[in-house]
């Protein structure tokens, strides 16, 4: 397909004094409409920074790490902080802290930083160390992330941390199920967390510690390996995955594929993997994951590719687009003067434009990286702080032109809202809401969310509490209108009728076993807290 018309603009060149080496997952949009990110280094302290920048490239340094040694506040933040539902930013540093093995921090929009946790406080670093990727705030309000090293088996961990700083290691990798997770996690529509490990898994592949994995883990710490990479289907997935509008997960591998230069894959939440694209010398070694933009296509970056004479030996890197069918088009090739090695991936701002960073390159010979924007002609939209939740759950909406807003709707159901500023409003999931787009009616027109909000169903009770095959059971809950299936015990499909948003009747099917009652909707699966007893 023909590439869309695009315009790349270098907004800022880092020069050391304002930071250098912006690295993984470099930018996030704040409630003020500005973009926030980190640099892993800065002149004088080499501790790195947290910064904010306008869409035009006016940069403000909010925090300098390691103002004096030892660096108990952290050093080398590799990933951007995320915007918490409380309006603060939460992130990690790769090094520093009490034990110099990394930290989790909270920062106000004004730049006041609090260290929430220092890693390697437990014997043999059983709590993990060297967090490398971005955090995710789940629907339970806690933050989840990974450490590249440490844990009970020394191969990295998955952790949970409360907003106040209480950390729990919920899983330690052991090589056979994965090793050295580099990026963070996502919470998918089923409520589970998904991620990748850069090593482990298939130990017979060419990589010394395995070619890496894709995994699923519950918030309680039950891990399932979905796929072990073999090399030909990809190797070393250093970036995480994204859940697309079709419900599948998409991601990249740095190496492997038919050319051993990286690959793009699609994988279902049950673990069926489909190779989508194999990179070659024209664009290779993606270190960042993908985003699905408002046009339905996927956008990403490769760390290498382009003219090897400018950036020896493999080029300065590229920005690319992939259709849902797997057709890849290179949109921009970096030439060093406008940046090199876009390792951090892209963010689509609510103005429709893409924003990103390069780790190196830039004008003036500083080679400390750049901040850039890329327009492909997409229009404005709204984004949500959470895209999954139950009725009455609070949420934040980012966008522009909110002053004078006259309505907020969850897939057509009106919701209460408060306009906080021209770029931010708060709302709650209304009763009767169904999975679908969120829309905001502003004086300038209707803005639609870039992704559907998935309303989680709830099963509150059922009657009778027991019965034989053929018994009709009345199930009471919330958000049941879009029910796709009902199951008893081991979730053998049952015939059912949706009576209302709060009631479903189902017939106990042949083969049902004693256990919880579950209802699946496009928003996920609701499971009862009590068991239905199947009588003989």
Regions found by a protein language model. Name each.
Residues 474:
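Conserved beta-strand segments that form the floor/walls of ligand-binding pockets within enzyme
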Residues 1-469, 486-488, 500-512, 517-536:
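Extracellular beta-propeller repeat domains
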Residues 482:
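LysM (lysin motif) carbohydrate-binding repeats in extracellular/periplasmic proteins that recognize
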């Amino acid at each position: 397909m023909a590439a869309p018309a695009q315009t790349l603009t270098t907004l800022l060149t880092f020069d050391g004094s304002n930071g250098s080496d912006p690295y993984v997952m470099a930018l996030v949009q704040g409630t003020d409409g500005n973009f926030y990110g980190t640099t892993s280094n800065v002149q004088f302290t080499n501790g790195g920074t947290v910064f904010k920048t306008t869409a035009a490239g006016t940069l403000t340094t909010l925090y300098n790490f390691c103002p004096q040694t030892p660096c108990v506040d952290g050093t080398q933040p590799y990933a951007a902080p995320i915007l918490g539902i409380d309006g603060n930013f939460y992130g990690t540093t790769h090094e520093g802290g009490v034990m110099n093995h990394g930290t989790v921090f909270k920062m106000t929009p004004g730049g006041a930083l609090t260290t929430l946790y220092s890693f390697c406080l437990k014997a043999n670093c059983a709590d993990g160390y060297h967090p490398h990727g971005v955090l995710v705030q789940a629907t339970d309000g806690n933050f989840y992330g990974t450490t590249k090293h440490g844990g009970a088996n020394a191969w990295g961990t998955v952790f949970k941390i409360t907003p106040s700083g209480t950390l729990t290691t919920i899983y330690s990798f052991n090589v056979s199920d994965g090793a050295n997770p580099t990026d963070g996690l996502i919470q998918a529509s089923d409520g589970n967390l998904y991620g990748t490990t850069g090593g482990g898994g298939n130990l017979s592949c060419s990589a010394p510690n395995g070619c890496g994995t894709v995994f699923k883990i519950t918030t309680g710490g039950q891990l399932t390996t979905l796929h072990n990479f073999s090399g030909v289907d990809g190797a070393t997935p250093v970036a995480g995955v994204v859940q697309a509008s079709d419900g599948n997960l998409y991601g990249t591998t740095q190496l492997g594929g038919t050319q051993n230069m990286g690959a793009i894959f699609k994988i279902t939440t049950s673990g069926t993997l489909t190779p989508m694209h194999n990179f070659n010398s024209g664009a290779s070694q993606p270190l960042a994951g993908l985003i699905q933009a408002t046009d339905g296509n996927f956008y990403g970056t490769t760390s290498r590719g382009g003219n090897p004479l400018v950036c020896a030996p493999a080029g300065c890197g590229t920005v690319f687009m992939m259709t849902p069918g797997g057709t890849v088009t290179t949109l921009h090739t970096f030439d060093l003067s406008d940046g090199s090695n876009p390792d951090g991936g892209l963010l689509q701002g609510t103005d429709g434009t893409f924003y990103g960073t390069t780790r190196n390159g830039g004008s003036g010979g500083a080679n400390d990286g750049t901040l850039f924007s890329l327009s492909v002609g997409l229009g404005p939209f709204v984004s949500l702080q959470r895209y999954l939740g139950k009725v009455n759950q609070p949420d934040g909406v980012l966008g522009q032109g909110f002053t004078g807003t006259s309505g907020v709707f969850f897939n057509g159901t009106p919701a209460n809202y408060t306009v906080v500023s021209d770029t931010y409003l708060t709302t709650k999931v209304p009763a009767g809401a169904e999975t679908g787009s969120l829309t905001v009616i502003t004086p300038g027109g209707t803005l639609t969310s870039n992704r559907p909000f998935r309303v989680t169903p709830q099963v509150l009770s059922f009657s009778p509490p027991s019965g034989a095959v053929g018994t009709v059971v009345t199930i009471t809950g919330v958000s049941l209108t879009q029910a796709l299936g009902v199951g008893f015990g081991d979730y053998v499909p049952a015939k059912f009728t949706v009576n209302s948003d709060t009631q479903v009747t189902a017939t106990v099917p042949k083969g049902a076993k004693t256990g919880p009652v579950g209802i699946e909707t496009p928003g996920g699966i609701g499971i009862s807290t009590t068991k239905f007893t199947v009588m003989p």
